[in-house]
Amino acid sequence: YSDKDGNLFDPHNGKKDLENGKVNFIGLTDKRIKEDFLRILRYLRFFSNYSKQPHDPEVIKKLKMNIQGISKLSKERLLDELKKIAKIETLQNLSKDKISLEIILLIFPELKNIKIFSKLNKSNKNFLKRNDFIFLISLMIVDETDNVDYFLYKFNISTKNKKRIKNIDNFYKEKISSKTFNQNNINKYFYYYGREATLDILNFKLIKLNKVDKSLKELVKYYENKEALIMPVKAEFLMQKYEIPEGKLIGEKLKRIEEMWVKNDFKISDQEVDSIVNN
């Protein structure tokens, strides 16, 4: 710290540690951790971002001895700190460090796929630098189990972001085949779930593959610019042309027309509409 005249006071040699890339606690490690158990996570973040030295074994010993104190922290504070950790450079360094990885998984066991960041190719790394917390979290928690549900139950995430994560989770819980990512199939997903959800499932696949896939990249570019698909037949049209009264029947007819339109790659003829309405 410095006084009002700018004179530096450094009783713990912090300046020297900073110059040497050594991350340590100011004062007694055990005492500082017990003052605020969130400092365990902050240590991991600072170590991942600034350290040029290996962990001090005594520091790690104190971190592990106090790990149960994390349970005393609010979920909001834990999530806020996780958001600060969820930067691509931090995640990459953390996931490559065995000790840091072990500790963060004790605190956030739901981050099952965090090691994905240890081996990113250049293209994926550059892409993820531009991405947001929700997509990064999805990469870490989506698997074939109920892991996502547990994470969303445990932490207070907005309804909108919960839906976004669940869209990715639900998509990849289905059986993935060679036809999953053809344009006809993705068009249907785009229609029902929208642009953001479609780009999420495509980019998720690209990151998991961790290699250049030209067809997937072309799909991403296509759906970044694709206009929304709008069903051409409306209730007013059916009421006027076919004299169908407003109510349950018109809803049923519209649903069947929509299903036919989607099935036919978003095309439907007048004859097909006639057939559905008159049967």
Segments predicted by a language model, with ranges:
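Glycine- and charge-enriched loop/helix tracts that form the active or gating conduit
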Residues: 1-148, 153, 248-249, 253, ...
